[in-house]
Design a protein with these regions (language model features):
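Gly/Ser/Thr-rich active-site loops/lids in small-molecule metabolic enzymes
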Residues: 24-31, 62-91, 143
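Conserved phosphate/anionic-ligand binding catalytic regions in large, soluble enzymes, centered on
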Residues: 42-64, 120-134
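Catalytic or ion-coupling anion/metal-binding cores of large enzyme and transporter domains
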Residues: 77, 84-90, 103-105, 113-114, ...
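Single conserved hydrophobic/aromatic residue that forms the stacking wall/gate
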Residues: 1-7, 11
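Generic secondary-structure signature for well-ordered alpha-helical cores
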Residues: 33-41, 71, 75, 89-101, ...
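Flexible, glycine/charged-enriched surface loops at secondary-structure junctions
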Residues: 39-50, 77-85, 98-113, 171
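Active-site loops and adjacent core secondary-structure elements that bind or stabilize anionic groups
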Residues: 10, 116-122, 126, 132-140, ...
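Internal alpha/beta scaffold segment
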Residues: 12-44
Length: 172
């Protein structure tokens, strides 16, 4: 478990919520802000942080999507769905507007990047989880071939077409 997940278990899972259809995008933004402020005030996440959000699926799927979004996507990567990509940028700006910065001090650098992964869910309720990944996310990706050749990649490209839901059916 990351520090943010272990700490949130102690504080009654403030990184997970069941949203209702009437909550809409505003409900997503409100829960995001509630979580970021709680993490920042208590020092539960290393600020500035990479934020991963899982939306949809069952509770366990939602948590996995959020962790993958935080830990596996590289900074600057955008969701292939244009509306989700816009929401990622909007939440990043929103997180940086709360007046908290590095180590919980006053500032405008709470969020380095915000990544969202979406899963299928029932229309009666929508799971949402928020996860913080430390700024010092050290990672290297290499592929070892059968002939002994090693190739390194800058982008780990974890999300295949099979793993990622490419589009969301938006209701007008």
């Amino acid at each position: 478990l990351s520090r943010s997940s272990a700490a949130s278990d102690v504080y009654k899972r403030q990184d997970y919520r069941m949203l209702f259809p009437s909550d809409g995008i505003e409900g997503i933004k409100k829960f995001f802000l509630d979580t970021i402020v709680a993490f920042g005030k208590r020092g539960l996440a290393c600020q500035p942080a990479i934020i991963g959000i899982g939306i949809g699926g069952s509770k366990d799927t939602c948590m996995v999507l959020g962790k993958r979004a935080a830990c596996l996507r590289i900074v600057g990567d955008k969701n292939p769905d244009p509306k989700i990509s816009m929401l990622e940028e909007e939440l990043k700006d929103l997180g940086n507007s709360i007046g908290m910065g590095a180590m919980g001090f006053v500032g405008k650098s709470m969020v380095i990047d915000c990544n969202i992964e979406v899963g299928y869910c029932h229309t009666g309720g929508m799971q949402m989880s928020v996860h913080a990944f430390c700024l010092s996310s050290r990672r290297a990706v290499a592929r070892i071939h059968g002939d002994g050749k090693i190739t390194y990649r800058n982008n780990p490209d974890w999300f295949t077409d099979y793993q990622r839901r490419e589009t969301v059916e938006w209701q007008v």
